[in-house]
Amino acid sequence: LVQQYAPMLAAAASIVGSPAIRNRATIGGNIENASPAGDGLVALYGERAEIKLVSADGTRMVPVSKYVLAPKKTARKQNELIAEIQIPKEGCSHQEFFKQGRRNALAISVVNGCVSADANGDALNHVRVVLGAVAITPVELLEVGELVNGKRYTHELDEQVQKIIESSIHPIDDVRASKEYR
């Protein structure tokens, strides 16, 4: 079901950590960690996921894009638990997750992201681009979607997209990569 209805999440989950980590870790833990480089988290942004939180006070739904506030900081209150992760069933016809790390296995992302779109002849529609590890939270590049929607992807359009990306991200220097590399 995950591969069919949430292919970006399936792709991200298939390359997280080691087999031991993949067999014990949870998507909820990946979300709650709130790492800007979290592969599952970035994929959930791309999938437009919502987090269902429950407590003795009741239940509430929070879009994943509003759930992560900063590294290691989420909108979850101390008395709440993540009960469900809901992903819309209808997704785009083309969905891709990508990751760049310093090695092929057990790599924390230097940058990661996902792109989804519907193709209509030569034009792209419903374009969504999300990047991780380029700011304190994953970044959805709304301007890219607005620019690209309904257009044929050309070299000129690609140059405009690159400018939007450069102005929308705020990478940091850390042990994995310099901000210039990111």
Give names to the regions the model predicted.
Residues 1-182:
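C-terminal structural segment of proteins
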